[in-house]
UniProtKB/Swiss-Prot annotation:
One of its GO terms (biological process) is positive regulation of calcium ion import across plasma membrane. It catalyses: Na(+)(in) = Na(+)(out); Ca(2+)(in) = Ca(2+)(out); chloride(in) = chloride(out). ATP binds at K69, K71, T189, N294, R296, K314. This is P2X purinoceptor 5. Residues 56-341 are extracellular. Glycans are attached at N77, N157, N202.
């Protein structure tokens, strides 16, 4: 049994399977197949080719350069600074203009600082003390302003004080104005010039209108109908980013300016236009301890005696990050052929699904399954099968009933009876053959009778 199974397995390795086309008269399966074909065709035409434009070769390696320029002036009149006019050199950092720049909107100024000895500011845990031993000489104050001298300074009869430090004195004040210093910054304008290039297609463009009119950039402002005048009002950018200008100007913040280029180079170059998006990038929760954006800088001077002093400024403002990205597409035969081939493969998957429904799921599935799958043997294999059948016939037991032998003989007689009409010779030979068959039957009877005697 095991040898026969192994032989059958080896022979099955040399079987060849070929497709057989069966026309199934099933309206349900036929309708399902046409619906699947329609869905796949619509997916291929609408989504793949019209929406995703998968027939194009795509270039996402965008090369970009950004130049920014801020213009505007602001006037302030405070008790600490007096009357002062602020221009671009005062409130724009860095002044040369890059894709990241900062506009000052609020200041805390500590003027006339000189290096010397003074008390640390209150509210700094490492600078607080009760006695001199709490202030180790030579140690710096963590998150403070200078080095400890070893003395604890207390006011009046207070038991708590702050360490004496060597620093720029007086130290920076903690108080903050309730209104931004540069309220007029809302009307400042920002000019953003962007150059882009797609190297795969050697395509270049800028976001500024190509014109000979020298006064164009001096009179225009950006709008949805004027995309090639990239001059933005600062207050408008903050509003488009979903923020309030007075709030963000007081404590500062970070705003992203996104320039998106999505170019279809199968169309005219004039159809490749920039799209602008604005978003606030920093933590804008009002109760967060990390909200806002600020940094410090100083301006240094010397008095007539040559002693250096400075004005320390803690600047709050808006940091702008200009982020450019994009892609360009152009027709190419390679992605077109690939996507068409994928669509045809989906068609084949639809046919496979319908085959499963036809031969396994519907009511007459067994009938269709028998019609679809058929085994075909070669002539040599048919001869082998016939030989095996003859061998099995010869191995039939001797005690088989005589009636079955007679039935076989009668069937042979009926098969040969049709040949008697062919010639007279055959008619003459039939009685002799019949006599031989009778003798064979008698011999079989005798063997059956003698068999019990032998045993």
């Amino acid at each position: 049994m095991g040898q026969a199974a192994w032989k059958g397995f080896v022979l099955s390795l040399f079987d060849y399977k070929t497709a057989k086309f069966v026309v199934a008269k099933s309206k349900k399966v036929g309708l399902l197949y046409r619906v699947l074909q329609l869905i796949i065709l619509l997916y291929l035409l609408i989504w793949v080719f019209l929406i995703k434009k998968s027939y194009q070769d795509i270039d996402t390696s965008l090369q970009s350069a950004v130049v920014t320029k801020v213009k505007g002036v602001a006037y302030t009149n405070t008790t600490m600074l007096g009357e002062r006019l602020w221009d671009v050199a005062d409130f724009v950092i860095p002044s040369q203009g890059e894709n990241v720049f900062f506009v000052v909107t609020n200041l805390i100024v500590t003027p006339n600082q000189r290096q010397g000895i003074c008390a640390e500011r209150e509210g700094i845990p490492d600078g607080e003390c009760s006695e001199d031993d709490d202030c180790h000489a030579g140690e710096s104050v963590v998150a403070g302003h200078g080095l400890k001298t070893g003395r604890c300074l207390r006011v009046g009869n207070s038991t708590r004080g702050t360490c004496e430090i060597f620093a720029w004195c007086p130290v920076e004040t903690k108080s903050m104005p309730t209104d931004p210093l540069l309220k007029d910054a809302e009307s400042f304008t920002i000019f953003i010039k962007n150059f882009i290039r797609f190297p795969k297609f050697n395509f270049s463009k800028a976001n500024v209108l190509e014109t000979d009119n020298k006064h164009f950039l001096k009179t225009c402002h950006f709008s949805s109908t004027n995309l090639y005048c990239p001059i933005f009002r600062l207050g408008s950018i903050v509003r488009w980013a979903g923020a309030d200008f007075q709030d963000i100007a007081l404590k500062g913040g970070v705003i992203g300016i996104y320039i998106e280029w999505d170019c279809d180079l199968d169309k005219a170059a004039s159809k490749c236009n920039p799209h602008y998006y604005f978003n606030r990038l920093d933590n804008k929760h009002t109760h967060s301890i990390s909200s806002g954006y600020n940094f410090r800088f100083a301006r240094y001077y010397r008095d007539p005696n040559g002693v250096e002093f400075r004005d320390l400024m803690k600047a709050y403002g808006i940091r702008f990050d200009v982020i450019v990205n994009g892609k360009a597409g152009k027709f190419s035969i390679i992605p077109t052929v690939i996507n068409i081939g994928s669509g045809l493969a989906l068609m084949g998957a639809g046919a496979f699904f319908c085959d499963l429904v036809l031969i396994y799921l519907i009511r007459k599935s067994e009938f269709y399954r028998d019609k679809k799958f058929e085994k075909v043997r070669g002539q040599k294999e048919d001869a082998n099968v016939e030989v095996e059948a003859n061998e099995m016939e010869q191995e039939r037991p001797e005690d088989e009933p005589l009636e079955r032998v007679r039935q076989d003989e009668q069937s042979q007689e009926l098969a040969q009876s049709g040949r008697k009409q062919n010639s007279n010779c055959q008619v003459l030979l039939e009685p002799a053959r019949f006599g031989l068959r009778e003798n064979a039957i008698v011999n079989v009877k005798q063997s059956q009778i003698l068999h019990p005697v032998k045993t």
